[in-house]
Amino acid sequence: MEALIPVINKLQDVFNTVGADIIQLPQIAVVGTQSSGKSSVLESLVGRDLLPRGTGIVTRRPLILQLVHVDPEDRRKTSEENGVDGEEWGKFLHTKNKIYTDFDEIRQEIENETERVSGNNKGISDEPIHLKIFSPHVVNLTLVDLPGITKVPVGDQPKDIELQIRELILKYISNPNSIILAVTAANTDMATSEALKVAREVDPDGRRTLAVVTKLDLMDAGTDAMDVLMGRVIPVKLGLIGVVNRSQLDINNKKSVADSIRDEHGFLQKKYPSLANRNGTKYLARTLNRLLMHHIRDCLPELKTRINVLSAQYQSLLSSYGEPVEDMSATLLQLITKFATEYCNTIEGTAKYIETAELCGGARICYIFHETFGRTLESVDPLGGLTTIDVLTAIRNATGPRPALFVPEVSFELLVKRQVKRLEEPSLRCVELVHEEMQRIIQHCSNYSTQELLRFPKLHDAIVEVVTSLLRKRLPVTNEMVHNLVAIELAYINTKHPDFADACGLMNNNIEEQRRNRMRELPTSVPRDKMAGGAQAEQEGGTGTWRGMLKKGDEGQGEEKTKLQSSIPASPQKGHAVNLLDVPVPVARKLSAREQRDCEVIERLIKSYFLIVRKNIQDSVPKAVMHFLVNHVKDSLQSELVGQLYKPALLDDLLTESEDMAQRRNEAADMLKALQKASQVIAEIRETHLW
């Protein structure tokens, strides 16, 4: 299982090369308040002085420290290959292959790199420094040294320095694959430990938190850390380990880490003999190594899955970016053809990318025809906007100066044309809706079907312009045709239409039935000449003509109907003087039986004929729109695009990639290469390494 930590280090190196943190790798994050001894603990684990030391804020950038254990045989081999003279050496990621054998030089490089990014005062940065230490005296570990938690800004630190440091710490410890090393000084109250507090925010159960108590030798006289080290004060599931740091005086006197560890062991044996074997720097190193190995083992399956998923995603992304253009003519023709095909397929419903959130393309056009347009027509009232006064006025105006003996046919035509004209507006609105949907299909194809177009924004804009122009040209042609469909219906009122003749026949039968009912109700003393007159009317009505039908209705003056209250233009009643220069004024009175009958007949005929015309329009308008707009655009789109865009003079301009496309392609290629390498690294892990 020791082989797992080098594997994770390899993965970290792989992803560091592309500057990505999309994979959350197992690591140990060191958290603590400022000057609590975090860096001292890390130096004890390394066994060398390599970190900047001092008072105040010293660690101002995250330091990712990879400790790599090397055997003597491997060390000799590496020394020969790299020309390294020494058993321990370090490498920074930002200095590439440069090898440092002087640890003072490593410390100076950390300070220089920190100041380069964070400034030479007290500011912080979240950009990490990557350092790898090779030594036979270390165990395999990956640790992250983080800036200490502080409260008050100093130097050129911003006022929200506490919040910045907190967010930086949370960024690392929120990683569910990280172990939190919470460092607290023994000469402070554990109940007020900021490190444990912030660790508990992201790990409330303490499943991945290990507490370290530093400065055991600096506790007040007469006190000890027995209860704390036994876990009686703050219980932590992964354990609690005490260590002794070097003092600033020891550092000034050049006391080595090895001597410090030896003195630490002596102090623990003297002060805490029963706990000495479960505390100290060496025990901490072994514990961290064991915890990290088990943690990596638990995280590995999910890590494999994540890398495989990301590989597939970046492969798809790279494919969508396409290869650099070599043959411009072929590429342009291919993109134009693909767009035209996808546009037509979206209308036909055979597109590769089917929208699931809403209707689009041909399905939406169908919805417009049969739901939107169909329901709008059905909601148009055949007699809407037509009152009894309008009907009677039309009848009177149609007779001119002569009194009407029968209902004039001209009044029917006049009124029915007025009603049919109302179908034109929803028909033209239907054309507009289909036109808008065909515009939307352009964007749909750009977003879902032909992502290659996004590589070439000028080509995309040119295609949109050509298709929009084609649709714009077809719109007036289609509108004209739809207008003509309504005009055709208005041009000739066909009263011999089979459906209309049936309606007239039914009306004849209805009026005849009403007349017979009235005849039965007449008193027996009715004179014979009236009876004969009725028979004569029946004979005249039997011809089946419109005039005969209306004449039959004229006999029904005795029929009991609801008397409509209305105002009609009428002559002044007898007995009153009239100024002939006055305009006739409406007079409120009850309609006569004949006026009621005339209105009813005209209204029934209008309704019957209107329904016939509405049915025709509901059928013919979608056909006209399909022929003159949809199908015409489908058939001519390819040739229109080729004719407008496939020109040698336009090739260079149209196939100019967007500024960031080449960069994004390179980034995606680098990331894919890193993921493939990471997948290869994980694949090398033998199952025996896991146990």
Curated annotation (Swiss-Prot):
Region (Important for homodimerization): 609-623
GO molecular function list: GTP binding; GTPase activity; lipid binding; microtubule binding; protein homodimerization activity
Record-annotated GED domain positions: 599-690
Localisation per UniProt entry: Cytoplasm, Cytosol; Golgi apparatus; Endomembrane system; Mitochondrion outer membrane
Chain residue ranges for the region called Disordered: 522-573
Catalytic activity field: GTP + H2O = GDP + phosphate + H(+)
Enzyme Commission number(s) from the entry: 3.6.5.5
Naturally occurring in which organism (per UniProt): Danio rerio
SMART domains, A to Z: DYNc (SM00053), GED (SM00302)
Segments of this protein annotated with the region Middle domain: 343-488
Region (G5 motif): 244-247
Entries under PANTHER family matching the protein: DYNAMIN, DYNAMIN-1-LIKE PROTEIN
Gene name for this UniProt entry: dnm1l
Annotated Dynamin-type G domain residues: 22-301
Span list, region G2 motif: 58-60
Region of interest: G3 motif: 145-148
Name of the protein: Dynamin-1-like protein
Entry comment, domain topic: The GED domain folds back to interact, in cis, with the GTP-binding domain and middle domain, and interacts, in trans, with the GED domains of other DNM1L molecules, and is thus critical for activating GTPase activity and for DNM1L dimerization.
Region of interest: G1 motif: 32-39
Major localisation: cytoplasm
Top-level taxon: Eukaryota
Biological function: Functions in mitochondrial and peroxisomal division. Mediates membrane fission through oligomerization into membrane-associated tubular structures that wrap around the scission site to constrict and sever the mitochondrial membrane through a GTP hydrolysis-dependent mechanism. The specific recruitment at scission sites is mediated by membrane receptors like MFF, MIEF1 and MIEF2 for mitochondrial membranes.
